[in-house]
């Protein structure tokens, strides 16, 4: 839930009926408790004022105008001398009208109803906890059949003590023959349970720790059995094991969060504050109302009817009561999620009513559009492009975006360095884009991380921190390895950039949100910063080299420069020797001077490593020199031996691309080792 002072956290979950009552109930100065909505009315058609105990009641939700009660009396808000603080005639407190944005009410349901999110949504949490098929639970909730209620230490007519056996509908026709009407009602209320009340009884009797222990024991037994050889049976066992794992995780979550399973069955239905479901008067005197008001009215109408059947008339047939309970359940289902059970409810113009789920979910819902998607200061947006020369923790920020985001910091820097006398002069320098501006901007950005976010933010890697650097152009540059965490592509995707202002936010960005600290997937633990797409193609081109071996390369006339434009004469053709280099720096220098190509084969001097030499491999060629030394040429390496056959040096056959990749890997390993040595 939200802290009332700092507003730093939000938790969404199940609440107890006591908590709902505590949110909605208010004690007036005269000791009267208000909060329950009992009437389905909104405004009086003559006075245009909210109906008492209705959906817009001022006693429950507060006054429409600050300090003015329903009678029209006025009191100064917060004045201790003014007494009393509420109107004794209408019972409305003299408080600020903004209370109608957060003051809730509740409807006391005449029968328990299941929360449709936890029954019908997949996976069904109620079905998982009770380990029963969803269709049977739906039939029980909507009064299609019943089960025998066990009664401890009492004799039962059905003699099914301690068991929950579902009965077919024949009990409605066979069992009543043994009773009078009054006797059958007593028997049904005592030994038969149906509707959401039956679900609530079963959930209340659950021991979550026993569920975890038994589920683990069954999962272990299924794992020890091994495959049966029957593909259908093996799939069935696999599905059962997956279900047991989900059931254990669900039970652990209930224990960890101190939530009782029976809270998934509602006894009190919360009523939203009136300002969140308004009625607006438009031109011509017509009224526009939120769809939720109509759905609330439907619930109250049916609930009041059920209350009358249960309290005023003792001779009401049980079938009629069960039918009315089903109607109340369906009305609450429509309020929470219209259309989840089939055809949605529509108005007179054949328009589907927007339920509570429709209001909060989706791209246009309350969270994504109003709370998460709203415009904020110190933020910008632009297209992302690949920045292969960037470090993993850096991003390229265009100058136009950077100067706008860090404008206040640049102004402070200009004034501190006495380059501007006041804010107006500093803004003038920024508009004229003087060279000193970019120098100060560089200094400001060096120690200030930024947050990059790509919508939709489906997991925590959807927003990460980077160290910004200035780049030319109008696009944000990103390292290609962070693409997968954002689920982004460099084909026109846009990302938002935010500047953390407080020291706490900057510390959190540096310690938890930097991209080089989020290399593993938080869901499964696998590496998420892995080469994909362009990087794989680049690595392939870098390390492909020539496909021809040393022999084919030697006598292939295609090695001659400009061979397409010259006449090939095999008799006058001379082989161009593959160059020798003492170290990788000389090889890369030759490539930069365009003396060799990226995939040109070359000989690179290597350390005396016996692992390079194949013991049983015969040399392809042996070259002797005048001093007695000779070269043994193999497929991928070359050995220089002395007169005494001692190894003087070894050369390996490689390319500039392989050398570049090796140097990058070696540098990364050395950096990792240095970091580990610092930690120890």
Curated annotation (Swiss-Prot):
GO terms for molecular function: DNA binding; DNA-directed RNA polymerase activity; magnesium ion binding; zinc ion binding. GO terms for cellular component: chloroplast; DNA-directed RNA polymerase complex; mitochondrion. It is found in: Plastid, Chloroplast. Keywords: Chloroplast, DNA-directed RNA polymerase, Magnesium, Metal-binding, Nucleotidyltransferase, Plastid, Transcription, Transferase, Zinc. InterPro entries: DNA-dir_RpoC_beta_prime (IPR045867), RNA_pol_asu (IPR000722), RNA_pol_N (IPR006592), RNA_pol_Rpb1_1 (IPR007080), RNA_pol_Rpb1_3_sf (IPR042102), RNA_pol_Rpb1_clamp_domain (IPR044893), RNApol_RpoC1 (IPR034678). It catalyses: RNA(n) + a ribonucleoside 5'-triphosphate = RNA(n+1) + diphosphate. GO terms for biological process: DNA-templated transcription. Mg(2+) binds at residues 489, 491, 493. Its EC number is 2.7.7.6. Its cofactor is Mg(2+); Zn(2+). DNA-dependent RNA polymerase catalyzes the transcription of DNA into RNA using the four ribonucleoside triphosphates as substrates. This is DNA-directed RNA polymerase subunit beta'. It comes from Carica papaya. The lineage of its organism: Eukaryota, Viridiplantae, Streptophyta, Embryophyta, Tracheophyta.
